[in-house]
From Swiss-Prot:
Organism expressing this protein natively: Bacillus anthracis
The protein's name in its UniProt record: Probable disulfide bond formation protein D
Lineage: Bacteria, Bacillati, Bacillota, Bacilli, Bacillales
GO MF terms, alphabetically ordered: oxidoreductase activity
Annotated signal peptide: 1-28
Family the UniProt entry places it in: Belongs to the thioredoxin family. DsbA subfamily.
Purpose of the protein: May be required for disulfide bond formation in some proteins.
Length: 217
């Protein structure tokens, strides 16, 4: 009887030890993914939508002048938000890739200046500037347009602070770092979308397949 109790106790200890080892391995894998993501995309410095502990990180490289990015915002993002982001499965990050025209940089700077004050306001701006989009051959992103968006749609943003930040060295440096990151990753166009560090086709069906694959790991 005593021998049986000892064997049972040893079995329990062994089971606990195995669980600890498995837990350590899983924790290590998750942290490795986070470290890889932080190295590639600098998650902590980027605009994000969704829970920080979401298991899948989706990164969009975009240009507010890009017609395909506007289409992505209108057709793909709402479904991504409904099926994954709002359920805590995906956290979305936006990284500037201003490549179409001179005013692409101004749009990127505006987004960063708004994000500096309030992250939720950035995502309102994200939708509003895409709704204001004109032909990509026109320089339609102007300070007048940006100020109108801030004044009319973003009550949490201090307008005077926004004006100061828009052309500040700090904001220009942030946009430059985003551009450098895109260059290092050899981003070819926008929107370019990554799922847990892997480049994916930006259409919803392809993203769903890539996300579901990551969720099963």
């Amino acid at each position: 009887m005593k021998s049986s109790n000892k064997l049972m106790a040893l079995g329990i200890v062994f089971s606990i030890a195995v669980l600890i080892v498995i837990g350590t391995i899983v924790y290590s894998i998750i942290n490795d993914k986070k470290d890889k993501g932080n190295e590639m995309f600098a998650y902590s410095t980027q605009q994000s939508l969704g829970k920080d502990d979401a298991p899948v990180k989706v990164v969009e490289f975009g240009d507010f002048k890009c017609p395909a990015c506007r289409t992505w915002d209108v057709t793909v993002l709402p479904r991504l938000k409904e099926e994954y982001i709002d359920k805590g499965k995906v956290q979305l990050y936006f990284i500037n890739f201003p490549f179409i025209g001179k005013d692409s940089d101004l749009g990127a700077a505006a987004g960063e200046a708004i994000y500096k004050q309030d992250q939720d306001s950035f995502w309102i701006f994200y939708d509003e500037i895409y709704q204001s989009q004109k032909k990509d051959t026109e320089e339609w992103i102007t300070e007048e347009l940006l100020l109108n968006i801030v004044k009319e749609k973003l009550p949490k943003i201090d307008v005077e602070q926004f004006k100061k930040d828009l052309h500040s060295k700090e904001i220009k440096e942030k946009v430059r770092k985003d551009s450098d990151r895109a260059q290092k990753l050899k981003v070819q166009g926008a929107p370019s979308v990554y799922v847990n560090g892997n480049l994916a086709n930006p259409d919803f069906d392809s993203l769903k397949k890539a996300i579901d694959k990551e969720l099963k790991k």
